[in-house]
């Protein structure tokens, strides 16, 4: 795949040679199987995604606020090896892999959506908005394929990739407010808006709005993630994370309103100046097999929850920086999360520049606990 | 490479509190109404009581009650309440399902509800079932009334209304109190006090919601007192008890929803008891539903109710006359739920983000800094020429 790129042994990151990620010593492996991915960007990582295709050697891509996009591949030494990098002249707000993992869509804060072809290592602008592009998702439907982008310009746009390099817009949906988060699990798409409403779309035969749900959360929505039903076949609902340290689990077609609920998370254990501090929930991911979810927050912890049993499975120890984004591999074996400053305390709060990427083996941690009777 | 400003390590830290994160939040723990006795939390290893022990103890008690003579029937309910106290002491936390099953086993005995339908001590039984029904308190109390248990006990309706209010169904809470009046529950003062307290708390909630929306300018318009807006989907309005309305006995009581009428029919009409029974309970599906209702996880967020002093209610259901909020008091050894004479001292919470981010996302803020964002020092990306590639 990368043979034609001509990189060879050329240095990729910061002038240093390509090196494998650092594995923790054996003494720590028995206690903690986490390991760091070498070559994390120098600025906050906004998005991190595993490649969608289940492979023997999964790939990992991340986009950061300094416009850096990097791709790693899991090598034979069981570490992630840096493979490619691109520099975009704007913060990266979202990325989306194409289904065969050969290309990456990039949502940028400079109002453009780009396509990075990994084989040729070239980038093209494939869509534009009137405001920063907040989300991008590749829709691989039964009858069509397109790129869905959501923006702060209050529009949701769908782009055709067949006529490149021409930008072909297939559809545009005018929204009442800015797009803050979105997720796609065909045939369902959910879009969270700044007015705390969630638009639900049916993507079969084109996007069709099927529901407009008011969020159960009182504060700004920060992330959203779709989950499947108990048979793990079809999308059934979504989980919302807010800046108030609370997550809402919402079913789209709810038979019993009591199935929808919210729970608190990512709050300080001790009092700080007499107050319990509430942190933002920065990202939510569902385990593809178990159906459990992991939340990451500005408090530097990740927590794993079983939404069906409404119990918490695990909480990590606090990390020295906020956790900004996470993803679970399609095999369910790995959880990747990024550390970095998330701007929650403004520009002056950025006291620790840089970022870290940690891989955590999660197949056992996120397994639902058996019910005792 | 430059030296890292801090030493990052993935070594596991000693954080004992992490294991109990779930229990730290008061909404995730449903305490008993009167708190937990401190002795019950200081368990010795040899005194550990298991689920099987509790089941066996109840079976023995029920067998013993079967052999009681008729003259000792008044002791039967007291022994059951003693068993409940024992259970709450020995199996304080984490046995809500077992407790509900055992309580259901008690009330489902033949003739039990009919025998004690006027005994106010049954209020404790219903309260315990409601508290351990995984958030289905409304159904439990409704079932009690449908079986004509404590139909005329005003304290039951007050407790029922309070539990519904805790679930956030304020309109339904009002309906419960209306049902109390329709059923001629006594003493009426309890119903009046509960109603006043409910409206007071409702006003306080509205004021707090208004205070939290400081940036919004609400245009207030005055409306005629008789043109109050409806609340919720039903055509009901807030209860306003004018002196003239209270003394007027000729007007009919407000009607309920059809669903409520079908399930809970009043036994009193025009302030007089009906000459014959008008309610016949034949829906067996309800019984089967309630038998296993504790398996349905209806997670309802609870928050403290700062009740006004109401000795009538507390006196009917508890031996203590304290009318304050029950809240957790943490210490270095264990966490004890207790009733304090002073007001609650629960720590306040605040969001650890800048105020501007309540309305503006982090990414919007970063995008607004462009092109002067400190991260933007890179060159423009190269454009792709597909024609050249082909």
From Swiss-Prot, chain A:
PROSITE patterns for the chain: WD_REPEATS_1, WD_REPEATS_2, WD_REPEATS_REGION
Main localization of the protein described in the UniProt heading: nucleus
Keyword Protein transport attached: yes
Tissue-level expression: Expressed along the ventral and dorsal nerve cords.
Keywords linked to the UniProt accession: Acetylation, Cell projection, mRNA transport, Nuclear pore complex, Nucleus, Protein transport, Repeat, Synapse, Translocation, Transport, WD repeat
MF term (GO), any: ubiquitin binding
Residues with PTM N-acetylmethionine: 1
GO biological-process terms attached to the record: mRNA transport; protein transport; RNA export from nucleus; transcription-dependent tethering of RNA polymerase II gene DNA at nuclear periphery
Presence of the UniProt keyword Nucleus in the record: yes
Subcellular location: Nucleus, Nuclear pore complex; Nucleus; Cell projection, Axon; Synapse
WD repeat intervals: 40-82, 87-126, 128-169, 276-315
Family in the record: Belongs to the WD repeat rae1 family.
Subunit structure: The nuclear pore complex (NPC) constitutes the exclusive means of nucleocytoplasmic transport. NPCs allow the passive diffusion of ions and small molecules and the active, nuclear transport receptor-mediated bidirectional transport of macromolecules such as proteins, RNAs, ribonucleoparticles (RNPs), and ribosomal subunits across the nuclear envelope. Interacts with rpm-1.
PANTHER family the record matches: MRNA EXPORT FACTOR AND BUB3
Name the record gives this protein: mRNA export factor rae-1
């Amino acid at each position: 795949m990368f043979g034609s790129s001509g990189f060879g042994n050329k240095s990729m990151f910061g002038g240093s040679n390509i090196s494998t990620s650092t594995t923790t010593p054996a003494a720590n492996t028995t206690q903690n199987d986490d390991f760091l991915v070498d070559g994390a960007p120098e600025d906050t990582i906004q998005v991190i995604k595993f490649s969608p295709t289940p492979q023997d050697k999964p790939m990992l891509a991340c986009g950061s606020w300094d416009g850096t996009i990097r791709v790693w591949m899991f090598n034979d030494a069981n570490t992630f090896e840096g493979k490619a990098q691109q520099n975009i002249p704007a913060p990266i707000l979202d990325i989306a892999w194409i289904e065969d993992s050969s290309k990456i869509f990039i949502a940028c804060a400079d109002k453009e959506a780009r396509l990075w072809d990994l084989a040729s290592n070239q980038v093209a602008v494939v869509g534009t908005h009137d405001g920063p592009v907040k989300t991008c998702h590749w829709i691989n439907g039964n009858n069509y394929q397109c790129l869905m982008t959501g923006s702060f310009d209050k529009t949701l746009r769908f782009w055709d990739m067949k006529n490149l390099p021409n930008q072909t817009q297939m559809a545009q949906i005018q929204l009442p407010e800015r797009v803050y988060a979105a997720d796609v699990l065909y045939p369902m798409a959910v879009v969270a808006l700044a007015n705390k409403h969630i638009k639900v779309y049916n993507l079969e035969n084109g996007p069709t709005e099927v529901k407009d749900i008011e969020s159960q959360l009182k504060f700004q929505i920060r992330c959203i993630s779709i989950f499947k039903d108990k048979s793990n076949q079809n999308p059934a609902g979504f989980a919302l994370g807010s800046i108030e340290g609370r997550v809402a689990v919402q079913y789209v077609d709810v038979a019993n309103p009591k199935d929808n609920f919210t729970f608190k998370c990512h709050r300080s254990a001790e009092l700080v100046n007499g107050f319990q501090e509430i942190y933002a929930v920065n990202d939510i991911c569902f385990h593809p097999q178990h159906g459990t979810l992991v939340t990451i927050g500005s408090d530097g912890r990740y927590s794993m929850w079983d939404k069906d049993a409404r119990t918490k499975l695990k909480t990590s120890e606090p990390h020295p920086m906020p956790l900004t984004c996470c993803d679970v591999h399609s095999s369910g074996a790995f959880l990747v999360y990024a550390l970095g400053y998330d701007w929650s305390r403004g520009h002056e709060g950025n006291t620790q520049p840089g970022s870290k990427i940690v891989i955590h083996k999660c197949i056992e941690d996120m397994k639902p606990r058996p019910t005792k009777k | 490479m430059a030296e890292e400003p801090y030493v990052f390590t993935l070594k596991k830290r000693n954080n004992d509190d992490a294991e109990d994160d779930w229990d730290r939040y008061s909404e995730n723990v449903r305490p008993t109404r009167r708190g937990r006795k401190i002795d019950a939390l200081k368990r010795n290893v040899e005194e550990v009581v298991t689920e099987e022990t509790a089941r066996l103890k109840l079976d023995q008690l029920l067998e013993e009650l079967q052999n009681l003579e008729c003259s000792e029937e008044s002791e039967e309910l007291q022994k059951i309440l003693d068993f409940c106290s024992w259970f709450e002491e020995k199996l304080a936390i984490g046995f809500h399902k077992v407790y509900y099953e055992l309580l259901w086993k008690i009330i489902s005995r033949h003739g039990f509800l009919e025998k004690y339908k006027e005994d106010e001590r049954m209020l404790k039984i219903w309260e315990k079932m409601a508290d351990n029904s995984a958030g289905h308190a409304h159904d439990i109390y409704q079932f009690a009334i449908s079986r004509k248990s404590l139909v005329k006990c005003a304290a039951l309706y007050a407790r029922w209304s309070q539990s519904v209010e805790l679930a956030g169904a304020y309109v339904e809470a009002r309906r419960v109190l209306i049902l109390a009046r329709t059923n001629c529950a006594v003493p009426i003062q309890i119903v009046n006090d509960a109603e006043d307290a409910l409206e007071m708390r409702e006003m306080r909630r509205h004021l707090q919601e208004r205070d939290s929306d400081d940036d919004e300018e609400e245009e207030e318009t005055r409306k005629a007192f008789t043109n109050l807006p409806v609340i919720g989907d039903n055509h009901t309005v807030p209860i306003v008890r004018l002196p003239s309305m209270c003394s007027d006995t000729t007007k009919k009581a407000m009607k309920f929803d059809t669903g409520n009428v079908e399930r809970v029919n009043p036994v009193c009409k025009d302030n007089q008891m009906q000459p014959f029974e008008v309610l016949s309970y034949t829906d067996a599906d309800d019984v089967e539903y309630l038998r296993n209702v504790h398996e349905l996880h209806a997670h309802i967020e609870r928050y403290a109710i700062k009740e006004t002093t109401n000795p009538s209610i507390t006196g009917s259901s508890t031996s203590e006359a304290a009318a304050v909020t029950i809240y957790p008091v943490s210490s270095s050894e264990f966490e004890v739920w207790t009733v304090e004479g002073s007001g609650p001292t629960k720590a306040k919470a605040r969001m650890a983000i800048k105020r501007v981010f309540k309305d503006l996302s982090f990414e919007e803020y970063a995008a607004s800094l462009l092109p002067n964002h400190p991260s933007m020092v890179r060159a423009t990306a190269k454009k792709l020429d597909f024609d050249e590639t082909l």
